[in-house]
């Protein structure tokens, strides 16, 4: 059965909505238009920004965003891998781009403003620009050292002002640029530019937010992925703040693993001697200081028990439990700082767990008798090193014992 032929409208014109009136260009035609506009604007970045602003109303930035950003950064379209498609035809290139700018922070910052204005004007370019920078970082091997430096500075400045997210840095963990040493060198330049705009806290906060704080070692080949090498490399480059940051982050990761293992051993009621040996080995292997370990031990010991909900019974239960593990704590409280940290941890714990409020003084006295805490540490805590939590309550509890320590004349009775 034949289908009826559908009627055809003749002589009818459909008007395109103004917002859809975009010139239909192939990438090469789009390129030629952008290159011509940049060349006409010359080195006047304000004129370049105005050209890009007005051109967006007639050129299809959404479709050709990668071409647009290739030209603004490298001066021409880039082939996969980063080579310039138009390298032999100077009419298809422009020198008014990031790679031909002066290798100077202020000069690159001025170019960064061009990108900021463009992306503020055409918000849909934000994701495309992020993808472009990720791509360019993968192409680093194809760029000269000075081009790499300028791209690093641009990226650092745009990271600092929030135009780019820190997640772009994942491209630096690619094997081919890591093995060549390009990733680490680029990262140093990028972080320096970032910190010139903001500060170290801005960098470390963004890295944590992007879950990159524990991946920084991946900037180096596998045989050099250790804290010492990272610290030496970044410190010599003038970025000691990042070296210190990585040490802290690695230490935190190590402490979590140590705490997990200790919790397991405590639940299995392992002999204290075995736990002492294990902790000492971990301290040596991971360069953990004693003050960091004592607080962790206190947490593990207190987490190992299901505490009685009745205030009048919990103190007795706590003293019995802590008396058992006092020898373990004593091994790792040989320094004044360690003792003060332990005292502060006990204070915070008793404040945060209301049933322990009245047990604080008894715990401190127990630790004093078991050689976990010294007279000097207790007196220092009492005079100046206590924390704010429950201060008045705990200082009042400790008053008589402190007087006894100070006078050492009359016997203290619990």
Curated annotation (Swiss-Prot):
<dbReference type="Pfam" id="PF02020">
    <property type="entry name" value="W2"/>
</dbReference>
<feature type="region of interest" description="Disordered">
    <location>
        <begin position="1"/>
        <end position="22"/>
    </location>
</feature>
<keyword id="KW-0810">Translation regulation</keyword>
<comment type="function">
    <text>Translation initiation regulator which may repress non-AUG initiated translation and repeat-associated non-AUG (RAN) initiated translation by acting as a competitive inhibitor of eukaryotic translation initiation factor 5 (EIF5) function.</text>
</comment>
<dbReference type="GO" id="GO:0005737">
    <property type="term" value="C:cytoplasm"/>
</dbReference>
<dbReference type="InterPro" id="IPR003307">
    <property type="entry name" value="W2_domain"/>
</dbReference>
<dbReference type="InterPro" id="IPR051245">
    <property type="entry name" value="eIF5-mimic_regulator"/>
</dbReference>
<dbReference type="InterPro" id="IPR016024">
    <property type="entry name" value="ARM-type_fold"/>
</dbReference>
<dbReference type="Pfam" id="PF25504">
    <property type="entry name" value="HEAT_5MP1_2"/>
</dbReference>
<keyword id="KW-0963">Cytoplasm</keyword>
<comment type="similarity">
    <text>Belongs to the BZW family.</text>
</comment>
<dbReference type="InterPro" id="IPR043510">
    <property type="entry name" value="W2_BZW1/2"/>
</dbReference>
<dbReference type="GO" id="GO:0006446">
    <property type="term" value="P:regulation of translational initiation"/>
</dbReference>
<protein>
    <recommendedName>
        <fullName>eIF5-mimic protein 1</fullName>
    </recommendedName>
</protein>
<feature type="domain" description="W2">
    <location>
        <begin position="248"/>
        <end position="414"/>
    </location>
</feature>
